[in-house]
Amino acid sequence: MSRKRSRPTTDPNSRSPAGATVERSVAPDLPRFESPASRVGRWLLPALLGLVTFLGLLFPLYDTDFWWHLRTGEWILEHGSVPQLDLYTFTDSDRPWIDLHWGFQVLITLLYRVGGVGLVIVAKAVVITAAVLIAFRATGEGWPVTWRVACWIPAVVCIVGRGYERPEMLSQLFLSIWLWVAFRLDRQPRLVWLLPVVQLVWVNCHALFVLG
């Protein structure tokens, strides 16, 4: 059986006492081996994390703030403008109101008109699950996927416990996109142009746009 031999290289700085050139053998670079089970786990475990997150978010609508957001969204679509005065306080109806959530309110109103509360709940689950997976993808590179998933389990428990149909669900998505871009700017600098678009939408959906 023939055996591959490494190619000898000459090191000009390494010489014997007599002045003769010394040859050293350099081992060839070996391809990194990844078992089929490791390849499957690299995609399967994050997929399971996303599935558990999605299913955990499919619970009935409990948050009572949803309804005034929905009514405000209906008002915006009916009048074609964002309210400038308080719509809901009888004793102080002329107080100026800066509606920081109008983008979210229009979104849930459109979803509600198409599929009712059920579609709003599914959309919430999709948005928050996407936020989790994007943030998972953005962080922990170089760690074994099992460790990364294990570290994310407590976070998912907290996120699901707070997974309401509120404007903050969009903040979770936009913040995860910011993280994803930030961790890739050194390799893909053009991604920076995505951030103004994200920020423009975010600033019209939730007050936590200041995190971006």
What function would you assign to each model-found segment?
Residues 1-55:
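Start-transfer (signal-anchor) and selected internal transmembrane alpha helices
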Residues 74-95, 103:
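Extracytosolic helix-loop segments that constitute the early lumenal/periplasmic catalytic or substrate-binding loops
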Residues 53, 155-159, 181, 192-207, ...:
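Membrane-interface alpha helices of multi-pass inner-membrane proteins
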Residues 134, 154-158, 170-187:
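Specific aromatic-rich, kink-prone transmembrane helix
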Residues 91-118, 122:
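Short hydrophobic/aromatic helix or loop-helix immediately within or flanking a transmembrane segment
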Residues 163-170:
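Short acidic/glycine- and proline-prone juxtamembrane loop motifs at membrane-interface regions
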Residues 122-141:
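Transmembrane-helix motifs of polytopic, lipid-linked glycan transferases
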Residues 54-70:
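Helix-to-loop transition at the C-terminal end of transmembrane segments
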